[in-house]
Design a protein with these regions (language model features):
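Sec-dependent N-terminal signal peptides
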Residues: 4-14
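OB-fold and OB-like single-stranded nucleic-acid-recognition modules
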Residues: 18-120
Length: 120
């Protein structure tokens, strides 16, 4: 019985992992609402410590204001990072996994933990 439960658990876990579709930056707007993986360079970022929600914003794919994707890290998620994300990820190639949403018609991925951003 335990062996069967273990096998079912492994199958479910692999289905979740493979459920993330890797897409190109040019395809972001076609996948709003989807959970995807996007690989690109981080060109910079900022910690808005005086803003109401104190987010950290990473510019993916180009410099601000031309970045085709913004990676948003909220204050609770930021505390889980070992280093300042806006410093650590700058000029690095990364793969970010998460759900694409739009903010003012611009694609973004909200990150809830450090494991969603992997340095290549």
């Amino acid at each position: 019985m335990k062996k069967g439960l273990f096998i079912v658990s492994i199958l479910l876990l692999s289905a979740v992992v493979h459920g993330q579709q890797e897409i190109k930056l040019e395809e972001l707007t076609k996948h709003v609402g989807d959970s995807v993986t996007v690989c690109t360079k981080i060109y910079g970022g900022i910690f808005l410590d005086r803003s109401k929600d104190t987010p950290t914003l990473l510019n993916a794919g180009d410099k601000y204001p031309n970045a085709p994707l913004t990676i948003v890290i909220g204050p609770d998620a930021r505390q889980k990072f070992k280093e300042k994300p806006e410093v650590f990820y700058k000029d690095k190639e990364v793969c970010v996994t998460g759900k694409i949403s739009l903010y003012k018609d611009k694609p973004q991925i909200v990150v809830y933990n450090e494991q969603q951003i992997v340095v290549k």
